[in-house]
Amino acid sequence: MRNIFKRNQEPNVAPATTTATMPLAPVAPADNSTESTGPGESQEDMFAKLKEKFFNEINKIPLPPWALIAMAVVAGLLLLTCCFCICKKCCCKKKKNKKEKGKGMKNAMNMKDMKGGQDDDDAETGLTEGEGEGEEEKEPENLGKLQFSLDYDFQANQLTVGVLQAAELPALDMGGTSDPYVKVFLLPDKKKKYETKVHRKTLNPAFNETFTFKVPYQELAGKTLVMAIYDFDRFSKHDIIGEVKVPMNTVDLGQPIEEWRDLQGGEKEEPEKLGDICTSLRYVPTAGKLTVCILEAKNLKKMDVGGLSDPYVKIHLMQNGKRLKKKKTTVKKKTLNPYFNESFSFEIPFEQIQKVQVVVTVLDYDKLGKNEAIGKIFVGSNATGTELRHWSDMLANPRRPIAQWHSLKPEEEVDALLGKNK
């Protein structure tokens, strides 16, 4: 047993080996004093090396020291300026956001207060929002006043209207005045319309003009007298200042009447459709001959009681506002779409062709009274729109007839343009 135990223990004993032993240097004990080479000392060495290298590189640059210092100062200033701008922008943005936020809260509070106050007011008055708006009254605009007179002759069945004077009219012109005149007519019939003379540059015109309407007394009650004051403008549409309406069934015509009435706002007159006319122009320069052919008209204004007209056409050759020659067509009875096809010739030398105008007027023939103008146009070198284009086409195509439709214009408008072109 003892032998077995010894045999089992033998492998645990390491065999003796011969190894070369190296002499070891004595190891100094660890010391935490400042004399040891730590990381702080290595960083200082690196910084010193970098500093030395940096100055060596600078010394290689072929510039004087003062130039290098100046460049460094400028670079520093630029850097500081950029930093300042960035900081300022950030601060302003924060301030703006804060201000808008505060303003939004304030507006919300104000709206809430206003709504609450409005609700309280509505509760006190018992009015809803729509009813409150309806109660607001606009102050009437002061348009001035008109003095007029009325006198009815029962034996002659004739109403005499006197337009006496106006006062305190508003200024519609640039100079602080107006050029007023009065239109007088009886509704619902606008065919018979009178006008006073134009009074220049005044707000208190004295008209003192009378006009007569032949109306049976039985029919007078269904009519309304209208006296509308306009501001005359030579080169554009006349502006209405105001009007006085007198329903005749509210007036006692047993004795003459004279009174003042305030002007009320008048409705602007829509441009009246007067109809269209087709004309043909032909000019032969070598012969100095102008041929005007009146072909037809359509959709003319109704001038007669029966809803028709008796139209005919007048042609005037004019130069510098003077009538040189006059021609006219035959009368076409009871029609608003007459067909004429009538030609008229005028002798005009080539050197004068650009100095003349051809005025075409459509009139309604009246056997008993005055023939009334339905509408008017003129063609020539100083015309405008389709009239000027028609004249230019005629001159560009000598010896060739050029036909063109034209819309009729009010007589006074065309006369004003002709007067401007004198």
Swiss-Prot record:
Residues 88-422 are cytoplasmic. The chain crosses the membrane at residues 61-87. Residues 14-30 have a biased composition (Low complexity). PROSITE patterns: C2. Phosphorylation at Thr-202 by WNK1, changes the calcium requirement for SYT2-binding to phospholipid membranes. Residues 119-139 have a biased composition (Acidic residues). Residues 31-40 have a biased composition (Polar residues). It is a single-pass membrane protein. Residues 136-382 are annotated as: Phospholipid binding. Its cofactor is Ca(2+). The first C2 domain mediates Ca(2+)-dependent phospholipid binding. Exhibits calcium-dependent phospholipid and inositol polyphosphate binding properties. May have a regulatory role in the membrane interactions during trafficking of synaptic vesicles at the active zone of the synapse. Plays a role in dendrite formation by melanocytes. This is Synaptotagmin-2. It comes from Mus musculus (Mouse). The gene is Syt2.
